[in-house]
């Protein structure tokens, strides 16, 4: 039995998230369906670094699976690329140590959120970015983001549906990239993220850029440990990308 590590990307627009769910199209289900065919009807379970929600994309999701097939990692990659749908891509497949774990072995992740600042709505980017035709003060967004860096209890910045007992996470950095006059990308790097955390942080920073909230409001929200104390909305899913997963 050999363990394999794969880095995959996918367009989340046509999926009801990553995780298998009854009677819905998910990333996990499509990959496991392909592996089952390769293993002549035998079920093969995959494990990912984490789940993504409906409409959320991935540029560098990491999965692992075990197989008894006597084929090279390169052939696995080629076969899975052919046997999975067009909205999933296998960037790499390699043999991994038997104790490698895509989920529990992570030491950090990077998410990016893409914002289109065009005055006129672009239908061709609607599934891949948030359309935000309002003025933004990037300097204010950067000032607000500084209050979020470091180790904090992020209860106020995650969904009430979060299943984790501890809401303490460390944000290493929040960077802002103006790729062009119309595109703003916010990159979040941390040791882990809670359910809807990046989307709530994005909504908060957009409010800061509009002058609706101040850096002090963010500090108060962090200390309140209560999502209801934060007025910012959760940014929609289509602008969010799981960009990279780090391991030791």
From Swiss-Prot:
<feature type="active site" description="Nucleophile">
    <location>
        <position position="53"/>
    </location>
</feature>
<keyword id="KW-0413">Isomerase</keyword>
<keyword id="KW-0819">tRNA processing</keyword>
<dbReference type="GO" id="GO:0003723">
    <property type="term" value="F:RNA binding"/>
</dbReference>
<dbReference type="InterPro" id="IPR020097">
    <property type="entry name" value="PsdUridine_synth_TruA_a/b_dom"/>
</dbReference>
<dbReference type="InterPro" id="IPR020094">
    <property type="entry name" value="TruA/RsuA/RluB/E/F_N"/>
</dbReference>
<comment type="subunit">
    <text>Homodimer.</text>
</comment>
<comment type="function">
    <text>Formation of pseudouridine at positions 38, 39 and 40 in the anticodon stem and loop of transfer RNAs.</text>
</comment>
<dbReference type="GO" id="GO:0031119">
    <property type="term" value="P:tRNA pseudouridine synthesis"/>
</dbReference>
<dbReference type="InterPro" id="IPR020103">
    <property type="entry name" value="PsdUridine_synth_cat_dom_sf"/>
</dbReference>
<dbReference type="InterPro" id="IPR001406">
    <property type="entry name" value="PsdUridine_synth_TruA"/>
</dbReference>
<dbReference type="Pfam" id="PF01416">
    <property type="entry name" value="PseudoU_synth_1"/>
</dbReference>
<comment type="similarity">
    <text>Belongs to the tRNA pseudouridine synthase TruA family.</text>
</comment>
<dbReference type="InterPro" id="IPR020095">
    <property type="entry name" value="PsdUridine_synth_TruA_C"/>
</dbReference>
<dbReference type="GO" id="GO:0160147">
    <property type="term" value="F:tRNA pseudouridine(38-40) synthase activity"/>
</dbReference>
<feature type="binding site">
    <location>
        <position position="111"/>
    </location>
    <ligand>
        <name>substrate</name>
    </ligand>
</feature>
<protein>
    <recommendedName>
        <fullName>tRNA pseudouridine synthase A</fullName>
        <ecNumber>5.4.99.12</ecNumber>
    </recommendedName>
</protein>
